[in-house]
């Protein structure tokens, strides 16, 4: 099972990725984790990536693809893998195909922007304990206060509406185009084309999970 999970920040990809990992016994691979592991291991690609990052640059696609090929050759990928947050752009997707990295499924968790803003901007956190609330979906007993300690809840900077909207804008500009790319690839009928699956992510987590696993033949 080799798949790519797509979806905007806040669409619930992380939760669904955990279900998929557990069901199929495959690792979840993110470019950030790959880069950190390669830098730590001191591999040639890792050292090259570190030099670029230390200079404040963006790691080139050819290095990323090289790291991907190294990573998926490891033993824990024998049954497949789940790419989270990769590829981010069409050039990366094309480079992956050119490098012979085959994918079985592309799964998009689809949630409208307005629903994501409501989800994320409504989050409140008790920093000391990590307890999380939502002003609409999981409100504290007393507005703005932690249920256990009575201490103030805060809104993380990442959850502020303007920040969420900026992240969504970046997603639509860079990554959402992949949805169209993989959709067309699936329609092309090419033997190498992955199956493209779009799942409504606005429903209960368990319902989304069941639909995802069903689409993957589980």
From Swiss-Prot:
One Pfam assignment: ADK
EC assignment: 2.7.4.3
Keywords: ATP-binding, Cytoplasm, Kinase, Nucleotide biosynthesis, Nucleotide-binding, Transferase
Stretches the record annotates as NMP: 30-59
Subunit structure of this chain's protein: Monomer.
Residues reported in the UniProt entry to bind AMP: 31, 36, 57-59, 85-88, 92, 156, 167
Similarity-based family: Belongs to the adenylate kinase family.
Gene: adk
GO biological process, one term: AMP salvage
Region of interest called LID, as start-end residue ranges on this chain: 122-159
Organism of derivation: Chromobacterium violaceum (strain ATCC 12472 / DSM 30191 / JCM 1249 / CCUG 213 / NBRC 12614 / NCIMB 9131 / NCTC 9757 / MK)
Protein name (database record): Adenylate kinase
Pathway(s) per entry: Purine metabolism; AMP biosynthesis via salvage pathway; AMP from ADP: step 1/1
Gene3D superfamilies: P-loop containing nucleotide triphosphate hydrolases
GO molecular function: adenylate kinase activity; ATP binding
